[in-house]
Amino acid sequence: DVYKRQVVTYQTAYLKKYYPKEFLAGVLNNRIDKIDEIAKYVVYMKEKNIAVYPPDVNKSKAYFSVQGDGLRFGLCALRGVGIGAMEKVIEEREKNGLFKDFPDFLMRCIRFLNKKMVESLIFGGAFDSMGKRRSQYEAVYEDLMKRLAAIDKQKMSAQMSLFGDIIQEEAPKANYPDIPEWDTTEKLSREKSVLGVYVSGHPFGAYAAHFTDCNFHTGLLADYEEDEETGDRTYHQIKIDDKVTMGGIVAAVRKINTKSGTIMAFITIEDLYGSVECVAFPRIYDKIKSCLLYTSDAADEL
């Protein structure tokens, strides 16, 4: 057993050093249905300057894959899509070629997709390369799916008909409204809701340059013992009772009434590396509560 563990440790170290992207792809694919763990390793990749590419119906495989200088999200990694359905999407693309546009995708995949799956793909940016805005895809997908479901039903009936009715073979055109993209906060929030992490940007990104003198960020919260997958050991010099400063956005505030009738709060702060929950006891909460009225596009130093 000791010998086997040593062999595994050596193999892990070798792969991590010489094939880091392939190694991490394997790690992520072992956790393809655990979105919180995927988020942890995506943050790790960003720290190691390994590019993370968003899902794309014409470029992604079912699982995470190495592409260029980084890894691309697999379609199966999105929350709410279903592994079986995404494998069928990949199979359709490999058999009949790239999807020409959004209606073409829906027409060819309508039999194994539902509205929630399509919505998740939109939120995750899987159609961005097709040239329209996510807000436009969201505006038309339900109507398109209804029309395509009716066409598909006609096709099924025609196959059973003696007369072989002529049925529309081309995808119907989408009537995209001329509307702006969602604002940055909403776009990134929806993206994170299905990917577990921000990929195309970060709501704190516009403010990060103003916080370079802070002595703490959430990347320092990595495990201090050796990580079983990456083999890394992480240590830092911040000690208990040290004063720390960090820059981040207020992502969530959970207020609690204390026994004495005062209010304290648990505040989730997000920065470019991840998130951390801070505790504001009643005296501190009373001082900062006015700052917590901002939405997540406001940066606060705590």
Regions found by a protein language model. Give the residues of each.
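Noncatalytic, beta-rich nucleic-acid-contacting surfaces in large DNA/RNA-processing enzymes
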Residues: 4-296
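A short, hydrophobic C-terminal helix/tail in secreted or cell-surface proteins
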Residues: 297-302
